[in-house]
UniProtKB/Swiss-Prot annotation:
Pathway linked to the protein: Carbohydrate metabolism; tricarboxylic acid cycle; succinate from succinyl-CoA (ligase route): step 1/1
Protein family membership: Belongs to the succinate/malate CoA ligase beta subunit family.
Gene: sucC
Chain residues that bind substrate: N256, G318, I319, T320
UniProt catalytic activity: succinate + ATP + CoA = succinyl-CoA + ADP + phosphate; GTP + succinate + CoA = succinyl-CoA + GDP + phosphate
Cofactor detail note: Binds 1 Mg(2+) ion per subunit.
E.C. number: 6.2.1.5
Co-factor requirement: Mg(2+)
Name under which the protein is recorded: Succinate--CoA ligase [ADP-forming] subunit beta
Amino acid sequence: MDLFEYQAKELFAKHNVPTTPGRVTTTAEDAKAIAEEIGKPVMIKAQVKVGGRGKAGGVKYAATPDDALTHAQNILGLDIKGHIVKKILVAEASDIAEEYYISFLLDRANRTYLAMCSVEGGVEIEVTAEENPDALAKVPVDAVKGVDLALAREIAEKGKLPAEVLDSAAVTIQKLWEVFVGEDATLVEVNPLVRTPDNQILALDGKVTLDGNADFRQPGHAEFEDKDATDPLELKAKEHDLNYVKLDGQVGIIGNGAGLVMSTLDVVAYAGENHNGVKPANFLDIGGGASAEVMAAGLDVILGDSQVKSVFVNVFGGITACDAVANGIVGALKTLGNTASKPLVVRLDGNKVEEGRAILAEFNHPLVIQAETMDAGADKAAALAAASN
């Protein structure tokens, strides 16, 4: 999960990384009030998860609260590379003597952590890496040993930071490592890390990417989720602990096991070529749980997508037998009632398949159509979706 700058700075403050005071807001009037509270010139900064804010007019210096009001009015609603600005950060402006760059990231290619540091900060680091690669130091970090003050100083030194700021920069670099490890991040980046005229080291900007696989031990990270940018159906699925990804097709997919669901997507897409080009509408893996509650939640999410014209349930019974899946489908349709209005093609195979098929046959719901094979089920679901368009 990528964070907004203001969220990254909240984590910086938690780990005592020095930065400038400020607050986030959604209105220009509040931006003026925050500037008045700060009592000094401020920066008005668009909060979007994309680079190039400054060039797009999303970062402005405001000498007075009235300037803050004007800039906030201009920035809110601005389109920056397809991202509409809904929030702005009002932060105290800082005098800058020099700008540096520092980041920690997961180096997947070499299966280690990596620190990157440069005396040339404040510009796109990709440009520096391409045009002047010697200016960007890359220092591997041992996952067990981590970053102590000595290594932090070495990172700063290899980044060619001035000798007079090495010690103070090392302290901040070590604290940024604490953010990286303590918050289960895959990226912590500060660009620029600045030196003020009185030799303070401040993180003026911040970019943090959190590892969603660590959410179970980071409950506080839930508050960082950008619900405005997340598809409402995906949010609804997440509330029920369903592994769901919305796609752009017309055939809803439910399966058990990521591999089977991925195969189902392919088979439905292939079948759709013969039926007006219909495509899968989603990825939904119910895992090993096919209870009535889980199935009802899954169907409720899929049927909430107005693009869905049919649903294909493709389940291979293993530990969760097909009779349990069939009972789950029956219970789900009873729970949903009239909400379930799209045809449901069901293909069961594996453990207790005959019992499962018998349960669905006895239920005899007008929307349920059974299929013997995955290919037949995909073709039927695609045909039904095409006929409804």
